[in-house]
Amino acid sequence: MRRNEYTHRRRHISNRHLSDKYYYAGEHETATGIRLTQYNEQSLHTKEVRITDTSFSKLSDPDQINWFEVSGLTNADAITRIVKDFGLHNLDAKDILTPQHVVKVEEYKGRMLIVLNSCYYDVNNEMRSEHISILVANNTVITFTESNNPVFEAAHKALLSNMLNIRKKGSGLLLAFLLNTIIANLVESASKVEEILEDIEETLLDPKNDQGNMGSLIQQHRHEYMIIRKNSLPLKDQFSKLLRTENGIITPDILPIYNDLQDQLQFVIQTTESCREITSSLVDLYISNNDLRMNAIMKRLTIVSTLFIPLTFLVGVWGMNFKIMPELDWRYGYFIAWAVMIATGVLTWLYICLLYTSDAADD
């Protein structure tokens, strides 16, 4: 095991114990950076915040919505200070620093913590999973991501275009856009896996196609849809809890947006169920195709061995070279032997063809 993998695993185990100090237990090495976006109906501006300026209560403007984007979780001390400054417990910092933590929604007085995992396909068409946490208050939103990938680029575009009058609304609508980005990635990933599995099914149904690596592809995409299901199913359960919160963040006028997000989550879960059924049928189909190919190979081997059994017998008899073998002294004995073997092979071949033709007619 490589050293960094051992370190991540050791830190992950350490985070499972009660402590006053926790570590980032993921694999990303992104340095912790903070970007602050402040907006209201009249203005919108973004700036970088130094990692030492983690007193967000002083940086926040009460007349604007303050969105702090924390990218990179390697500076665990800074993350812990941010959480404490937000009025939460050390254990909440542990949840933020521990990737693949169970999805949860925790409601506090006037604030809320959402811990979840997102997955998406990168530029190399490989599925990636990222641990994301969101702290929300009336006029403050703090997002924590493992890397500096533009996970919430769609939310920034919505702010620039003032989509759905987002700059006029409170932090609840910004939270809806953030969750929409995460759920949209789940929808896109689930739909892509389903499409790939359907393409594999078409390949397996056509015996002319090369099916050499189909087994590994089925296993790979089975693992991918399991990741999606693992991230979406708990989120749907916690989403109902999110809609029942009474901290005033999710106001009645934006509740339909959250209901739509819940419908999208239901679509993701239904798609993963479809992927599960397709994968199960693909495994059966792949095994069946392997059996058919094995039967075809055995059939060819049987034909070859049947052809050579009588020829081997004749060659074995004439190869004994006993003194009393009249055909050895015949003038044309060699040519007669060849003629007998060729005739035997041809007759055997005709018999095999006739036999398989009659079997096919019976079927």
Tell me the role of every PLM-derived stretch.
Residues 348-355:
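Membrane-helix cytosolic exit motif
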Residues 287, 322-325, 354:
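Juxtamembrane transmembrane-helix termini
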Residues 293-326, 335-345:
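Bilayer-spanning, highly hydrophobic alpha-helical transmembrane segments
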Residues 266-305:
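Membrane-interface, cytosolic juxtamembrane amphipathic helix immediately N-terminal to a transmembrane helix
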Residues 356-363:
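Conserved small/polar residues in nucleotide/adenosyl-binding loops
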Residues 1-244, 249-251, 257-260, 264-269, ...:
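Peripheral, non-transmembrane regulatory/ligand-interaction domains of membrane transport proteins
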Residues 84, 316, 353:
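Short polybasic/polar patches that bind polyanions
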